Amino acid sequence: MANNEYSDFALLSLNEDPKNLSGYDPYYLGWDRITSLSSTGVVGIHHPSGDVKKIATSFNLPANTTPYWRVNWSQTTNGFSVTEGGSSGSPLLTRNTHRVIGQLFGGSDINCNNPAADYAIYGQFHLSWDYGTNPQRRLKDWLDPNNTGAHS
């Protein structure tokens, strides 16, 4: 449907609703095109190369390095969690609203000796919204086709 390398997003249309498939119980995420974040931090959910779900947490605000959010992961009771290869396109969510604010673009090489130095780079959803010269290069035409000004 739409994609743009500027913020590294792709919007796909499914041929069938996963709710109608036996053995699937999908969970749909909301989105938010906010341009600045509160102090609650962020969460990355990913399935690296199709592996079981992983969750990475940051209690800090991501750095705004337009067109990307740069996220340094925080230590939790389970240690450090980082994004892994094969997780590209996975969502970045706010910790308070659990809405998508970015999509994974890349990050640092994993450093097991210094996990606090690991970071991830996410394309900013709000830039994916209207950065592009036609509907095939931006999200607003697909997620708000009536141009209501929706933010989430």
Positions of predicted regions on the chain:
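Extended hydrophobic-aromatic, low-complexity segments
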Residues: 52-56, 102, 111-113
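Serine endopeptidase catalytic core focused on the charge-relay Asp
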Residues: 1-73, 85
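N-terminal hydrophobic or amphipathic segments with adjacent small-residue motifs
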Residues: 38, 44, 80-83, 96, ...
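C-terminal cap/linker of serine protease catalytic domains
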Residues: 1, 5-9, 16-25, 49, ...
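Short, well-ordered loop/turn and helix-capping segments at boundaries between secondary-structure elements
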Residues: 50, 97-98, 106-109
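Broad hydrophobic/π-residue packing in well-ordered secondary structure
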Residues: 47, 93, 104-106, 115
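Catalytic nucleophile loop of clan PA
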Residues: 81-104
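Short, well-ordered junction/capping motifs at the entry into regular secondary structure
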Residues: 74-80
